């Protein structure tokens, strides 16, 4: 396709605006992949393991949709916690509830520069902000999805967003929830992934966090990761609705009393050996015995399970009523490390993980949707023969045209990220720590261009060999119809290469000059 001269001339007049940021994580088969540079070479990129914590200070009551604050709106708090995350040795946080209407630029920039990725739940416990497991058909509507799409808009431009969770423990063994909820989870994931492919500048993985129920979680996993009716060919409708990664909330290993065998960890490898999407523990850290020693870190998750699982997130960062915290916050906002913090820090320091290149990971990611295999595990599981609820016209319209959200976040170029903060941090001996945040230059490898999206989108059609991660261009939609029967080739883990199958164009200084020269040539 030829570029029009008007578009070419507009591009020549545009000046690139570059944002230094972390390189976004992508997926290949059952592994997360962290690019080693903006060239995104499979021979250099390495498998990424999540070493993280669940982060929701204040617990479920700490989120108020009517408030002008949430846990990522105060940069002073984020700087304090970024320091603690660095000392703990984590690279990822999971956040359960956020307000998509608030500005999160400073906090996400701090986390980016500190080397912290985020996995974000798109839902909250408020009315209209989640799928009601008791009434999925009545709550799968435009009110709910408009909030989900606004959430995606608010966070899609932060490269340190590792992924979104479409739901948390929606499918459980109460009532008939395992029967009625599964198709609606896939419907929400379909809608999210279609929206991302239409309105985001990159593929962002969409996953699901499963309840701590041994039989039900396996049935859920097989249902949510499948993308083929015959096991030989990917079905587009199934691929766009499958989970890109899968989280297990598991509390089976309790410090001091559990072992590899008694915890059931010895069965996890064989149970999930056929995974074609990344597996993590989205919550772990039994608190039956305190302080927790986290033996399951070195002996389990990053030990015997490391060939199948990709790490996990300890529950949880701050001490709440349920006594799972790693740190205690006082009324002034200052924090003190618990013994649990020190023990987890020690365990994470002693983790020894293999260095595996992306090129060593198979690209095969086909998994058969097998109704009998799923119902043999959990007889009451509702696959509905892998047919999904129809996509309401209002939702299809939002996917096509966007939700016109007023808040779209970005990494800041003119923000002097803080190295100190006005809170006191004490260790587990109650000694005050002299705290200074460090920022590794490696967290600014990605030069994101935030201009000239029209030209970049057009130019991408003639740059099929480019796999650069440095563009902020919006991919053209490949979904055709936004209806539930429409197909999409822009699934956020499609073919599990690069950042999905969306081709991006580099707009680093050298890349921009190369495009400039190409445009001149086209004009001539």
Curated annotation (Swiss-Prot):
<feature type="binding site">
    <location>
        <position position="169"/>
    </location>
    <ligand>
        <name>(1,3-beta-D-glucosyl)n 2</name>
    </ligand>
</feature>
<feature type="disulfide bond">
    <location>
        <begin position="226"/>
        <end position="369"/>
    </location>
</feature>
<feature type="glycosylation site" description="N-linked (GlcNAc...) asparagine">
    <location>
        <position position="404"/>
    </location>
</feature>
<feature type="glycosylation site" description="N-linked (GlcNAc...) asparagine">
    <location>
        <position position="350"/>
    </location>
</feature>
<feature type="binding site">
    <location>
        <position position="96"/>
    </location>
    <ligand>
        <name>(1,3-beta-D-glucosyl)n 1</name>
    </ligand>
</feature>
<feature type="disulfide bond">
    <location>
        <begin position="254"/>
        <end position="286"/>
    </location>
</feature>
<keyword id="KW-1015">Disulfide bond</keyword>
<dbReference type="GO" id="GO:0005886">
    <property type="term" value="C:plasma membrane"/>
</dbReference>
<keyword id="KW-0961">Cell wall biogenesis/degradation</keyword>
<keyword id="KW-0325">Glycoprotein</keyword>
<keyword id="KW-0808">Transferase</keyword>
<keyword id="KW-0732">Signal</keyword>
<dbReference type="Pfam" id="PF03198">
    <property type="entry name" value="Glyco_hydro_72"/>
</dbReference>
<dbReference type="GO" id="GO:0031505">
    <property type="term" value="P:fungal-type cell wall organization"/>
</dbReference>
<keyword id="KW-0472">Membrane</keyword>
<feature type="region of interest" description="Disordered">
    <location>
        <begin position="461"/>
        <end position="498"/>
    </location>
</feature>
<dbReference type="GO" id="GO:0042124">
    <property type="term" value="F:1,3-beta-glucanosyltransferase activity"/>
</dbReference>
<feature type="active site" description="Proton donor">
    <location>
        <position position="169"/>
    </location>
</feature>
<dbReference type="InterPro" id="IPR004886">
    <property type="entry name" value="Glucanosyltransferase"/>
</dbReference>
<feature type="disulfide bond">
    <location>
        <begin position="78"/>
        <end position="107"/>
    </location>
</feature>
<feature type="lipid moiety-binding region" description="GPI-anchor amidated glycine">
    <location>
        <position position="498"/>
    </location>
</feature>
<feature type="glycosylation site" description="N-linked (GlcNAc...) asparagine">
    <location>
        <position position="269"/>
    </location>
</feature>
<comment type="function">
    <text>Splits internally a 1,3-beta-glucan molecule and transfers the newly generated reducing end (the donor) to the non-reducing end of another 1,3-beta-glucan molecule (the acceptor) forming a 1,3-beta linkage, resulting in the elongation of 1,3-beta-glucan chains in the cell wall. Involved in cell wall biosynthesis and morphogenesis.</text>
</comment>
<dbReference type="GO" id="GO:0005576">
    <property type="term" value="C:extracellular region"/>
</dbReference>
<feature type="glycosylation site" description="N-linked (GlcNAc...) asparagine">
    <location>
        <position position="201"/>
    </location>
</feature>
<dbReference type="GO" id="GO:0071970">
    <property type="term" value="P:fungal-type cell wall (1-&gt;3)-beta-D-glucan biosynthetic process"/>
</dbReference>
<keyword id="KW-0336">GPI-anchor</keyword>
<feature type="active site" description="Nucleophile">
    <location>
        <position position="283"/>
    </location>
</feature>
<feature type="glycosylation site" description="N-linked (GlcNAc...) asparagine">
    <location>
        <position position="422"/>
    </location>
</feature>
<dbReference type="GO" id="GO:0009277">
    <property type="term" value="C:fungal-type cell wall"/>
</dbReference>
<feature type="propeptide" description="Removed in mature form">
    <location>
        <begin position="499"/>
        <end position="524"/>
    </location>
</feature>
<feature type="binding site">
    <location>
        <position position="315"/>
    </location>
    <ligand>
        <name>(1,3-beta-D-glucosyl)n 1</name>
    </ligand>
</feature>
<feature type="signal peptide">
    <location>
        <begin position="1"/>
        <end position="21"/>
    </location>
</feature>
<feature type="binding site">
    <location>
        <position position="212"/>
    </location>
    <ligand>
        <name>(1,3-beta-D-glucosyl)n 2</name>
    </ligand>
</feature>
<feature type="glycosylation site" description="N-linked (GlcNAc...) asparagine">
    <location>
        <position position="385"/>
    </location>
</feature>
<dbReference type="GO" id="GO:0000324">
    <property type="term" value="C:fungal-type vacuole"/>
</dbReference>
<dbReference type="InterPro" id="IPR017853">
    <property type="entry name" value="Glycoside_hydrolase_SF"/>
</dbReference>
<comment type="similarity">
    <text>Belongs to the glycosyl hydrolase 72 family.</text>
</comment>
<feature type="binding site">
    <location>
        <position position="217"/>
    </location>
    <ligand>
        <name>(1,3-beta-D-glucosyl)n 2</name>
    </ligand>
</feature>
<keyword id="KW-0964">Secreted</keyword>
<keyword id="KW-0449">Lipoprotein</keyword>
<keyword id="KW-0134">Cell wall</keyword>
């Amino acid at each position: 396709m030829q570029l029009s001269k008007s578009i070419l001339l507009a591009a020549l007049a545009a000046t690139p605006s570059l944002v230094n940021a972390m390189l976004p994580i992508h997926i290949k088969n059952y592994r997360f992949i962290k690019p080693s540079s903006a060239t995104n070479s499979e021979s250099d990129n390495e498998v990424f393991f999540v070493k993280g914590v669940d982060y929701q200070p204040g617990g479920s009551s700490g989120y108020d949709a009517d408030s002008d604050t949430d846990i990522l709106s105060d940069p002073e708090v984020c700087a304090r916690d970024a320091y603690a995350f660095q000392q703990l040795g984590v690279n990822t946080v999971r956040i359960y509830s956020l307000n998509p209407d608030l500005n999160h630029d400073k906090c996400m920039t701090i986390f980016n520069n500190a080397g912290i990725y985020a996995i974000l739940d798109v839902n909250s416990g408020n009315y209209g902000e989640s799928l009601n497991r008791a009434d999925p058909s009545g709550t799968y509507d435009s009110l709910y999805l408009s909030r989900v799409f606004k959430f995606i808009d608010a966070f899609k431009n932060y490269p340190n967003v590792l992924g979104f969770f479409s739901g948390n423990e929606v499918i459980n063994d109460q009532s008939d929830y395992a029967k009625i909820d599964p198709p609606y989870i896939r419907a929400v994931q379909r809608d999210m992934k279609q929206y991302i492919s239409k309105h985001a500048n990159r593929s962002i993985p969409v996953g699901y966090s499963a309840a701590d129920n041994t039989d039900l979680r396996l049935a859920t996993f097989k249902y949510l990761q499948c993308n083929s009716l015959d096991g030989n060919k990917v079905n587009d409708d199934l691929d766009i609705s499958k989970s890109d990664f899968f989280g297990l909330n598991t509390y089976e290993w309790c410090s001091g009393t559990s072992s590899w065998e008694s915890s059931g960890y010895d069965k996890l490898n064989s149970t999930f050996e056929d995974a074609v999407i990344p597996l993590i523990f989205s919550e772990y850290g039994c608190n039956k015995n305190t302080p927790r020693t986290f033996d399951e870190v070195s002996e389990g998750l990053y030990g015997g399970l490391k060939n199948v699982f990709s790490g996990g997130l300890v529950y949880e960062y701050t001490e709440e009523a349920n006594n799972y915290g790693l740190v205690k916050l006082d009324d002034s906002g200052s924090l003190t490390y618990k013994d649990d913090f020190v023990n987890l820090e020690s365990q994470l320091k002693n983790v020894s993980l293999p260095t595996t290149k992306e090129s060593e990971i198979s690209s095969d990611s086909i998994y058969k949707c097998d109704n009998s295999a799923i119902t043999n595990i959990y007889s009451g599981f509702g696959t509905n023969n892998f047919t999904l609820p129809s996509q309401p016209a209002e939702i299809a319209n939002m996917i096509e045209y966007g939700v016109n959200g007023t808040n779209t976040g970005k990494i800041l170029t003119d923000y002097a990220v803080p190295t100190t903060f006005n809170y006191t941090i004490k260790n587990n001996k109650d000694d005050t720590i002299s705290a200074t945040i460090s920022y590794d230059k490696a967290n600014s490898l990605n030069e994101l261009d935030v201009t000239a999206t029209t030209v970049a989108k057009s130019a991408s059609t003639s740059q099929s060999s480019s796999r650069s991660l440095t563009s902020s261009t919006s991919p053209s939609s490949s979904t055709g119809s936004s209806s539930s029967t429409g197909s999409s080739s822009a699934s956020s883990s499609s073919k599990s290469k690069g950042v999905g199958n969306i081709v991006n164009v580099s707009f680093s200084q050298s890349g921009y000059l190369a495009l400039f020269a190409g445009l001149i040539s086209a004009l001539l």
